Swiss-Prot record:
GO BP, one annotated term: DNA repair
Matches recorded under InterPro entries: LexA, LexA-like, LexA/Signal_pep-like_sf, LexA_DNA-bd_dom, LexA_repressor, Peptidase_S24_LexA, Peptidase_S24_S26A/B/C, WH-like_DNA-bd_sf
Domain of life where this protein originates: Bacteria
Annotated source species: Shewanella sp. (strain W3-18-1)
E.C. designation(s): 3.4.21.88
Gene Ontology MF terms in the entry: DNA binding; serine-type endopeptidase activity
Protein name, per record: LexA repressor
Subunit structure: Homodimer.
NCBIfam families: lexA
Repeat in keyword set: no
Alphabetically ordered keywords of this record: Autocatalytic cleavage, DNA damage, DNA repair, DNA replication, DNA-binding, Hydrolase, Repressor, SOS response, Transcription, Transcription regulation
Site entry: Cleavage: 88-89
Length: 206
């Protein structure tokens, strides 16, 4: 399935909510007003893009001629955000960090995935996590020794194998070219953002 841009995902969610609340889809003018477009024509262009991706069906000749495919109510719930550059001090799932949404069933991973993170570098290549991959992440705040985590160390986000010994945390790469990252919790900040639960190989997904 093709990914949605954040704006497309926002419009799709608006359509879904409007149908749930009123029993009918919004008009183009209503979409434009609620999302700050300058005209209904701008909303129409986004609707055409959603239709091309199979997310909605457009019925000509009526102002409310928007329909969700029969399976779409399920698929919408399966949109996983792809997290891009993370700003210092901001929650990892803040809307401004979301590059786009991928329509993938989060339950295909165990535990269920909450977001995707694009892998940078080759520090985890020995366990099949390669640069450019999309790493599926289950959001948690604590980890057990030996688990592969997404961790934030003093606002730098990294993917490593976790090990805690007293007040020290070691983040191990799966590549002999990289030394462990040592974190002293008495004077450094470390946040567990989630557990790695799977990989989508870049290029195979789109």
């Amino acid at each position: 399935m093709r990914p949605l841009t954040p704006r497309q995902a926002e419009i799709l969610e608006l359509i879904k909510r409007n149908i749930a609340d009123t029993g009918m889809p919004p008009t183009r003018a209503e979409i434009a007003t609620r999302l700050g477009f300058k005209s209904a024509n701008a909303a129409e262009e986004h609707l055409k893009a959603l239709a091309k991706k199979g997310c909605i069906e457009i019925m000509p000749g009526t102002s409310r001629g928007i329909r969700l495919p029969a399976e779409e109510e399920v698929v919408v719930e399966y949109g996983l955000p792809l997290i891009g550059q993370v700003a210092a001090g901001e929650p990892i799932l803040a809307q401004e960090h979301v590059e786009q949404y991928y329509q993938v069933d989060p339950s295909m991973f165990h535990p269920t995935a909450d977001f995707l993170l694009r892998v940078k570098g080759d520090s985890m290549k020995n366990i099949g996590i390669l640069e450019g991959d999309l790493l599926a992440v289950h959001k948690v705040q604590q980890a057990r020794n030996g688990q592969v985590v997404v961790a934030r160390v003093d606002d730098d986000v990294t993917v490593k194998r976790f090990e805690k010994k007293g007040n020290l945390v070691y983040l191990y790469a799966e590549n002999e070219d990289y030394s462990p990252i040592k974190v002293d919790l008495s004077c450094q900040s470390l946040t567990i953002e989630g557990l790695a639960v799977g990989v989508i190989r870049n290029g195979d997904w789109l």
